[in-house]
Amino acid sequence: MRTFLFLFAVLFFLTPAKNEFFDEKCGKLKGTCKNNCGKNEELIALCQKSLKCCRTIQPCGSIID
């Protein structure tokens, strides 16, 4: 019975992992289509289905392009 309760608690509290491989890419594959952009992201374009194309803001010291 303890094993069942332990397994139930572990499986109940696990969150599903997010797979970045299947996310829709945009902005020459440098952005991701989302409902809302995060704090460290900027809106660079619009995607289909009224989604926003967000790209992570790079710090000034490390500009990679």
Curated annotation (Swiss-Prot):
Listed Gene3D superfamilies: Antimicrobial Peptide, Beta-defensin 2, Chain A (3.10.360.10)
GO biological process per UniProt: defense response to bacterium; innate immune response
Purpose: Has antibacterial activity. Acts as a ligand for C-C chemokine receptor CCR2.
Keywords: Antibiotic, Antimicrobial, Defensin, Disulfide bond, Membrane, Secreted, Signal
InterPro entries per UniProt: Beta_defensin_dom
Compartments, as annotated in UniProt: Secreted; Membrane
Organism, scientific name: Pongo pygmaeus
Signal peptide feature range: 1-20
Membrane-spanning residues: none
Protein's UniProt name: Beta-defensin 106A
